[in-house]
């Protein structure tokens, strides 16, 4: 099944569903930005169909529940499609980094596990200096790391700390995989060797990113600015992706 052709066909067939057009437009704009090698400008709206919307659509002639559920499934799985086809896992955008820079001011950042460097690209666009690193272990599985927006140095997350953390004010980790319990060593290294550096982690706590042990050991830093930052981040699917500050 071709994702876009099926989505476009079903969206055209059920065009009377009010929010569908704006959702589809936002999705196409998002992928067009990624294909052009730039960050999307704005957060995505909530993607998917509500139960009342499906019920209303079923009153249309020739409407089929199976098709509506398929349409809803495609909308909900936009993140997965973009991740595996375009190498973007954390759905960051220009508005997020404009708010980030306003709240935290100019800083020097080290991004670890950077993939294609979307976070670094967003920070750089605001005038922040970045050192961008990734272990490049995903390139055989999908396009992550193959088309970086910024130069990316090869280094594991832990190694990058010892190589570059003393040159920056803050460290950012976005969308680290959730299958490796050894990731708990990363915040321990930060706490022991680089306690003065800020640590930002972008992901889903006890969910899609980082190991459960990582989150069990994580020490959050109270920071009211995160409320405004995460409002700017937005929320468009079942993944509750947030920006956290850890010690």
Predicted regions span which residues?
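N-terminal accessory regions of S-adenosyl-L-methionine
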Residues: 1-92, 237
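Conserved alpha-helix/loop element of class I SAM-dependent methyltransferases that forms part
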Residues: 83-107
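Conserved class I S-adenosyl-L-methionine
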Residues: 105-115
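Residues at the starts of beta-strands that form the adenosine-phosphate
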Residues: 108, 129, 198
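Conserved SAM-binding loop of SAM-dependent methyltransferases across substrates and taxa
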Residues: 116-128
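S-adenosyl-L-methionine
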Residues: 133-170
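A short SAM/SAH-binding and catalytic strip from SAM-dependent methyltransferases
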Residues: 168-183
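C-terminal substrate-binding/active-site "lid" region of AdoMet-derived donor-dependent transferases
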Residues: 181-247
């Amino acid at each position: 099944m071709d994702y876009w052709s099926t989505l476009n066909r079903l969206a055209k067939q059920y065009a009377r569903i009010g929010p569908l057009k704006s959702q589809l437009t936002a999705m196409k704009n998002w992928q067009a930005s990624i294909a052009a090698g730039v960050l999307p400008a704005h957060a995505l709206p909530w993607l998917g169909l509500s139960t009342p919307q499906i019920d209303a659509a079923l009153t249309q002639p020739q409407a089929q529940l199976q098709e509506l559920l398929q349409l809803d499934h495609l909308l909900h799985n936009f993140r997965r499609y973009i991740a595996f086809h375009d190498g973007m896992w954390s759905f960051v955008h220009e508005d997020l980094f404009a708010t980030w820079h306003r709240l935290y001011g100019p800083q020097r950042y080290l991004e670890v596990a950077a993939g294609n460097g979307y976070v670094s690209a967003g920070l750089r666009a605001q005038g922040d200096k970045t050192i961008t690193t990734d272990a490049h272990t995903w390139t055989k599985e999908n396009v992550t790391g193959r088309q970086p927006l910024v130069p990316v140095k090869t280094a594991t997350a832990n190694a990058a700390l010892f190589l570059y953390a003393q040159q920056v004010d803050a460290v950012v980790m976005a969308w680290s995989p959730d299958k490796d319990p050894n990731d708990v060593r990363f915040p321990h290294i930060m706490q022991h060797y680089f306690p003065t550096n800020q640590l930002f982690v972008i992901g889903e706590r006890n969910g899609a990113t980082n190991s459960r042990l990582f989150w069990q050991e994580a020490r959050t830093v109270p920071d009211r600015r995160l409320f405004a930052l995460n409002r700017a981040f937005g929320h468009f699917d079942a993944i509750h992706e947030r920006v956290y500050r850890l010690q």
